Swiss-Prot record:
CC terms in the record's Gene Ontology section: cytoplasm
Family statement: Belongs to the gamma-glutamyl phosphate reductase family.
Domain of life the protein comes from: Bacteria
Molecular function GO labels: glutamate-5-semialdehyde dehydrogenase activity; NADP binding
Pfam families, A to Z: Aldedh (PF00171)
Pathway: Amino-acid biosynthesis; L-proline biosynthesis; L-glutamate 5-semialdehyde from L-glutamate: step 2/2
Protein name, as recorded: Gamma-glutamyl phosphate reductase
Protein localization: Cytoplasm
Gene Ontology biological process terms, A to Z: L-proline biosynthetic process
InterPro entries: Ald_DH/histidinol_DH, Ald_DH_C, Ald_DH_N, Aldehyde_DH_dom, G-glutamylP_reductase_CS, Glu-5-SA_DH, GPR_dom
Length: 427
């Protein structure tokens, strides 16, 4: 336990400022640490996760029991649960991140001016990253590891629902840092579930360079409204799958069911299915049947409801709802134009997909839909940094500045200019 953890949690401002100071100091050391040391810390952290899998599971069981007692939804409980496979996936994720190319020091561009100045644009760490998240404890491993790989210090504040699980995972990351001879303060976990700690984090501009909030809409809205620190964020994942008139029916069926039902509680889960009227009679009966058999509640417009009595009426609110549950809204549209208009009106700019064998229609969709991730003939559940080959992601950003889409190692760096001269003076 470091000194910050020994401070009384009754003094939240003092506690958080101390954590911030330590993070800033550790970040300066980490920014200069060789890639070999950062990778060694990740590999040692992975080994610690495997060695402590039983202890992590016991702490997770406490959180799961408390979550059920609080009445958390099945979707939130699914996010909270750490099965042996998920613990192993965290360890493998750290190893995958260690295997990624080192982004720090990469020369992005270089040129020489007529006056002889040689200029390079070089990747460098951002500095200190604050991560605020709710019920998904694996974020502790993913976020800590990505920040470490990119040479950033991290301050992790998990939600009260995952408090015990997150602390157990953090202890493994700290063990990895120790084993590699790096400062433990490079990855700190806020040692209190007190919500006042979040309020402090959002004001700590002297110590934190960017904050990544991951959680429900209320958390993101609060952070967006109160933060004085820049953010990487997305408000919600209101994802669409559009089945075009020239979709392959079998492909459309399997992809759409996966996009909705593989894991309903993730932000890449499809929440609205749009079906072209020209293919509705072919695709809707088997699609509605498959979704219902998978346990999905169906809500649809009048045309959709005509195909099955199992479809309840969709309200105007449904088209703007991120369910994060086994519920989906379905609408029949006249054509690609109407699908594009619906997505423009209701998308959260996260991930939207078209299913079609028409290359021109696919290209138009990919060009005109203004979301961070646009897909053709692939499940929206692939909206994930790990699936993009990034090792993992710290979150998905739908913003317009710096990072957009999955925020991986490269997105956790900025750049500076190195200018080399031979005594030039400006006239």
């Amino acid at each position: 336990m470091n000194d910050a953890a020994r401070l009384t949690t009754d003094d939240i401002p003092g506690l958080m400022i101390d954590i911030g100071r330590r993070a800033r100091a550790a970040g300066r050391i980490l920014a200069l640490a060789p890639a070999a040391a950062r990778n060694a810390a990740l590999l040692a952290g992975a080994a610690a996760l495997r060695a402590e899998a039983g202890a992590i599971a016991l702490e997770n069981a406490k959180d799961m029991s408390a979550g059920r007692a609080k009445g958390l939804t099945d979707a939130l409980l699914d996010r909270l649960e750490l099965t042996p496979a998920r613990i192993e996936a965290m360890a493998k994720g750290l190893e995958d991140i260690a295997a990624l190319p080192d982004p720090v020091g990469t020369v992005l561009a270089g040129w020489q001016r007529p006056n002889g100045l040689r200029i390079e644009r070089v990747r460098v760490p951002i500095g200190v990253i604050g991560v605020i998240y709710e019920s998904r404890p694996n974020v502790t491993a993913d976020a800590g590891a990505l920040c470490l790989k990119a040479g950033n210090a991290a301050i992790l504040r998990g939600g009260s629902e995952s408090f015990n699980s997150s602390r157990a995972i953090h202890r493994c990351l700290a063990a990895g840092l120790r084993a590699a001879g790096l400062p433990e303060d490079a990855i700190q976990s806020v040692p209190t579930p007190d919500r006042a700690a979040v309020g402090m984090l959002l004001t700590m501009t002297d110590f934190i360079d960017v904050i990544v909030p991951r959680g429900g809409k209320s958390l993101i809205e609060r952070v967006s409204a109160e933060s004085k620190v820049p953010l990487f964020k997305h408000l919600e994942g209101l994802c669409h799958t559009y089945i075009h008139a020239k979709a392959d029916p079998q492909k459309a069926l399997s992809v759409t069911v996966n996009a909705k039902m593989r894991r309903t509680g993730v932000c890449g889960s499809t929440e609205t299915i749009l079906v072209d009227r020209a293919i509705a009679a072919t695709i809707l009966p088997p699609l509605l049947d498959a979704l219902a058999k998978a346990g999905c509640a169906l809500r649809g417009d009048e045309e959709t409801r005509a195909f099955s009595e199992r479809v309840g009426p969709a309200t105007a609110e449904d088209w703007d709802t991120e369910y994060l549950d086994a519920i989906v809204s379905i609408r029949v549209v006249a054509d690609l134009d109407e699908a594009l208009a619906h997505i423009a009106a209701h998308s959260s700019d996260h991930t939207d997909c078209i299913l079609t064998e028409d290359a021109a229609a696919a290209e138009r969709f990919l060009t005109e839909v203004d979301s961070a991730i646009v897909m053709h003939n692939a499940s929206t559940q692939f909206a994930d940094g790990g699936e993009f080959g990034m090792g993992a992601e710290i979150g998905i950003s739908t913003g317009r500045l710096h990072a957009r889409g999955p925020v991986g190692v490269e997105q956790l760096t900025i750049f500076k200019y190195k200018v080399r001269g031979t005594g030039q003076t400006r006239p």
